[in-house]
Amino acid sequence: MQVSLNPEWLARNNDEHKIRRNDHRSPFQRDRARILHSAAFRRLQAKTQVHGTSLNDFHRTRLTHSLEAAQIGTGIVAQIKLKQPEFRELLPSDSLIDSLCLAHDIGHPPYGHGGEIALNYMMRDHGGFEGNAQTFRIVTSLEPYTEHHGMNLSRRTLLGLLKYPALLSATRAAIPPPAVAHQRQLKAKDWSPAKGIYDCDLASLDWVLEPLCESDRELLGQMRAEPSSPKEHRKTRFKSLDCSIMELADDIAYGVHDLEDAIVLGMVTRAQWQEAAAAQLAECGDPWFEEHIAELSEMLFSGKHYVRKDAIGGIVNALLTSISVKPVEAPFHNELLAFNAYIEPHMGNALEVLKHFVSQYVIQIPQVQRFEYKGQQLIMDLFEALSADPERLLPQATGEKWRKAQEQDEGMRVICDYIAAMTDAYAQRLHQQLFSAQSHY
């Protein structure tokens, strides 16, 4: 397959003139370095992947999750190159897929889903909040690598980060839930955010999509079937090839590695695994799982670290090697959109079983939900205080940004950006400083 990609996909929004001696790196190697060395990436080490699980240091953080997703992502690309050599020229380089997987979570706020719900509610009249939208905003404008363009990443890298390539105003439910009388009454399910890009970041989105023909741009922003109720959010249909690989790597890291955490930390029992996962995997339609599930179950709950690790590695490998590139069922002209990576349907069923098991027995349990609820309340408290008197309470540099943004009536977005960037511990510390009688700074 002959591929001749437009050199515009290597372009950066700000044409840089860096003083770099003998710099022979590719654009994507430079992108990877910028992400790795960014403050936003470092903060992931203090944002927990699953909250309230343990006080020990075994459990995963957002940072270790991102590193594992990156390793799986490069593994997916390597095996597709072997299996489908005709796509070699189109597939992302290791540096590019690494960049996407490392950056995919940097927009996540403190306290995970609880923090996301809180910020979305507090920003309900100011454009909303959503983790993926915040990731795009960080890399295109907030991270101080350049003055106005964030990390100033390559255009293809930014395209790969667009999991939901539409504005939030296009995906948000037509009828929002009513505001609550008091924040303690807020129900998380009512304020789960729509997926997309902030309307205030339209210029950055337009720049990323500039090389596409008009029909490709329109098609990329197309929605799935209309929701059954005007109270439901709309969902985008399409994404780039690079993004589809990153998303599969993220799903595998979540479904398999978070399962490992849950087993080691004693959050799930063998009986729960047998009933809610193993039984379904034995009937998922994939011959590998059907043949090996009994042995895998023994290994996962053997109590021996190296045996469990071998089982985890086997599951990751089985999922990873069942991924291939196929044409997208839509008439895209650009090759980056015309093809996506897909997992074989039966293996896809197995991955859904694993993800559902993690959600049911790890994420949705009261122990974790109480922690997220606490974080949700804490973030709303912070937002309420900072937005009530920003000039008094915001740090000096953030206060300057707020004053400038307020001229365009966008001060709330600056406060939201400030809170979203916090680590769990920093948010808790600031809350104590503002609200605890015992706090001495």
UniProtKB/Swiss-Prot annotation:
Coiled coil: none
Keywords, ordered alphabetically: Hydrolase
GO molecular-function term, one example from the UniProt record: dGTPase activity
Occurrences of domain HD (ranges): 62-255
Domain of life: Bacteria
Protein's UniProt keywords contain Secreted: no
PROSITE patterns cross-referenced by the UniProt entry: HD
Gene3D superfamilies: Hypothetical protein af1432
InterPro entries listed in its UniProt record: dGTPase, dGTPase-like, dNTPase_2, HD/PDEase_dom, HD_domain, PHydrolase_assoc_dom
One GO BP annotation of this record: dGTP catabolic process
Family: Belongs to the dGTPase family. Type 2 subfamily.
NCBIfam families the UniProt entry points to: antiphage_dGTPase, dGTP_triPase, PRK05318.1
UniProt name for this protein: Deoxyguanosinetriphosphate triphosphohydrolase-like protein 1
Native organism: Vibrio cholerae serotype O1 (strain ATCC 39315 / El Tor Inaba N16961)
